[in-house]
């Protein structure tokens, strides 16, 4: 049978009286831009890179979307130090989704020293990245961030992450 609101006293039904999953939300009733969930990850391990190819450093975040047409906003804050015993240095970031490349950012952060200081380039900073993706399904999504250097592959061109602060990653479903 059905119960009409005329037979229920105001405030008589509380969340404790409802079975888990008894109430669902239709995507069409949610206001545009509603945040459905937020997943976060932080990494404190230092990584040193001296290769001009992308490498897996364990930067991973996972999210299971509620709707296939949801947007996923990825943000990450990498804290890094560039070093090169020459005039310039840079580094690269690759964002992957379930093992496939979404976006390559070659020479994402580029630093060049004044010619009189060519013997050594050191630059410390943080790097924010934001990327907008479409879920494309409701199965768990794994996002990986691969890193590398953009100017050569030797110990004279190095990048170190988490030198003094943790690296933070967020996946937000809207």
Annotate each language-model stretch with its function.
Residues 1-50, 54-57:
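Fibrous stalk/shaft segments of extracellular and virion attachment machinery
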Residues 42, 47-53, 65-140, 144-174:
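Terminal beta-strand-rich extracellular "head" domains
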């Amino acid at each position: 049978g059905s119960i009409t609101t005329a037979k229920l006293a105001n405030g008589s039904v509380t969340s404790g009286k409802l079975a888990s999953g008894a109430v669902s939300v239709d995507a069409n009733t949610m206001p545009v831009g509603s945040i459905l969930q937020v997943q976060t990850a932080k990494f404190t391990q230092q990584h040193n890179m001296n290769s001009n190819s992308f490498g897996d450093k364990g930067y991973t975040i996972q999210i299971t979307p509620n709707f296939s047409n949801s947007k996923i906003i990825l943000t990450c804050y990498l804290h890094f130090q560039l070093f090169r015993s020459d005039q310039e240095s840079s580094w690269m970031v690759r964002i992957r989704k379930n093992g496939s490349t979404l976006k390559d950012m070659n020479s994402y952060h580029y630093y060049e020293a004044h010619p009189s200081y060519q013997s050594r380039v050191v630059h410390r900073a943080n790097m924010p990245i934001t990327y907008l993706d479409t879920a494309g399904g409701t199965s768990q999504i794994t996002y990986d961030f691969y890193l590398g250097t953009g100017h050569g592959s030797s110990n004279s061109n190095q990048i170190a992450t988490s030198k003094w602060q943790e690296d933070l990653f967020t996946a937000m479903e809207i």
